[in-house]
C-alpha cells in the first residue's frame, strides 16, 4: 500500500501551522498588517522552505513593504520554529508574495466584463432584428 502523503508534504503542513502561530502570536511589527500563509513548499532534503504569503494591507502599506518587513524577521522566525518543531535541521525560511488571489480576482473581473459586453451586444442585435 502506498503512502498518501510524503514526508515533505507532512513537514510542509506542520510548518504552515507553526508559522501561522508564530506570526500571529510572536512577531510584533506594525508594518506587517495581517499576514496569511497560503502555502509552504519544502525542499526534498528539508533544508529550505518557501513560504507563500498574502497581506491585508491597510493605509499606505503595500505588499512589497509588508514583505520587506517580514523578511527582516526571517532569522528570528526560523529560531522560534526550531524550538517548536523537532527536526534534525530547521529549514531555512524564505518568504514570497503570493499573488494568485489578486490574479484570480483580476481574471474574474475580466470574464464578468466580457459577459456583460456580450449581453449588451445581444440586446442591441435583438432590437435591430425587430425593426
UniProtKB/Swiss-Prot annotation:
GO biological process, any: maturation of SSU-rRNA
One of the Pfam families matching this protein, by short name: RBFA
Keyword Cytoplasm included in the entry's annotation: yes
Keyword field: Cytoplasm, Ribosome biogenesis
Cystine residue pairs: none
Compartment list: Cytoplasm
Single GO molecular function: ribosomal small subunit binding
Any one GO CC term of the record: cytosol
Family: Belongs to the RbfA family.
Protein task: One of several proteins that assist in the late maturation steps of the functional core of the 30S ribosomal subunit. Associates with free 30S ribosomal subunits (but not with 30S subunits that are part of 70S ribosomes or polysomes). Required for efficient processing of 16S rRNA. May interact with the 5'-terminal helix region of 16S rRNA.
HAMAP family referenced in this protein's UniProt entry, alphabetically: RbfA
NCBIfam families: rbfA
Assembly: Monomer. Binds 30S ribosomal subunits, but not 50S ribosomal subunits or 70S ribosomes.
Name under which the protein is recorded: Ribosome-binding factor A
Native species: Vibrio vulnificus (strain YJ016)
